[in-house]
Amino acid sequence: MDQESRDRTLFNLNNEQLVVNIPVIFYVSVCLTLGTLGNGAVVYIFYRKMRRTATNLFVAALGICDLLCCTMYMPFDIISLRFSLTFYSEFLCHLENFSFAIGTILAAGIIFCIAVERYLRVCQPFRRHISRRLAMKMVPLMFIISFLLSIPAVWVFGKRTIWTGVRGITVEVCSYAEDNIHEIYPLYYYCTLLGLNLFVFSILMVLYYRIALCVWRYKRRRMKELQKINERTREPSEEEEPNEMEERVTVPHVTMKPYKIDQLNEAFKEKEKLIKKTNIVFFIVSLVWIVSYLPHYIATLWTIVHRRGVYTKSKSYVPYELAIRSYFMSCVANPFIYGLLNIRFRRELCKIFEKIFRRESLY
């Protein structure tokens, strides 16, 4: 077959494959748009507008990690889906999978640091916490560790030659390197990543369980203390006149007037509500993170074990391709979680929209 006929055949095959890939391209495009806008807002608000705490810095770093996935990884994925049989670049293939490995490990490290910081603040309030200055040093250190741990991805992935179904026409695609397709290295690599994520997730569940237990104990202790205060206000002693008892209430290390008890109770409730909501936000972020990665690992391990993917004409092809890219949901979901559950983030986001629309109305 001459070159012109080969190019024409590949062009037609590409167009046929494009029709099959349209749902996957649409999914990636939506994730790219929402993830870029949402994580851009997360980075700006949590780094510039929120309190300068270690937690907010970690959230901004996680937003940068997701933003890089949206701006560097997803566009190449869309191009490879559009020209699935004619687009291949060995450099971009290595870069794509290398950046995925870095993002996976770095996201796990940042989410782990957030959980540790929340645990120290809630369960160990009188001990030394992670300061913002220390967090500024921890983020680059985690990036260096992620970079080093991701180096094996360069050898695992690479060029692979596949048959197009037309006699005499083969193409090169980005997949597991031909030298490794029958080896055990890809299986070891993905099992290591999956084991690392599950290990971090297990520690997160233990930490958030301890946090919830500390909050519950704090609430029970507060109720007992307020009950003692109320009993002292209602039951004056024989040595003390009732009028004197109405003027002040005395408990160990605390002296206050009766009308301030309700104010103290409300202040405790507000603080408890804030702590509880903050912990719920980061617990949901951790849960979405691990859930969004599980379909990707399951589909990938199935491919490695069976040493083949899913045929394009199969009914399970589109679900398989969506499962391979399931972790994109983690990059998109976090801004919506903050927007729904974080009042301060929602207010700052509304201010940004007000400024944008106000400028447009001036022109």
Predicted features along the sequence, with ranges:
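Extracellular TM2-ECL1-early TM3 structural module of rhodopsin-like
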Residues: 17-29, 54-116, 121-132
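Loop architecture of class A 7-transmembrane GPCRs
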Residues: 7-13, 85-97, 101, 135, ...
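Intracellular effector-coupling site of seven-transmembrane GPCRs
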Residues: 64, 217-292, 296
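Fourth transmembrane helix
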Residues: 103-113, 120, 127-173, 199-209, ...
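Alpha-helical transmembrane segments of multi-pass membrane proteins
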Residues: 32-35, 61-74, 101, 105, ...
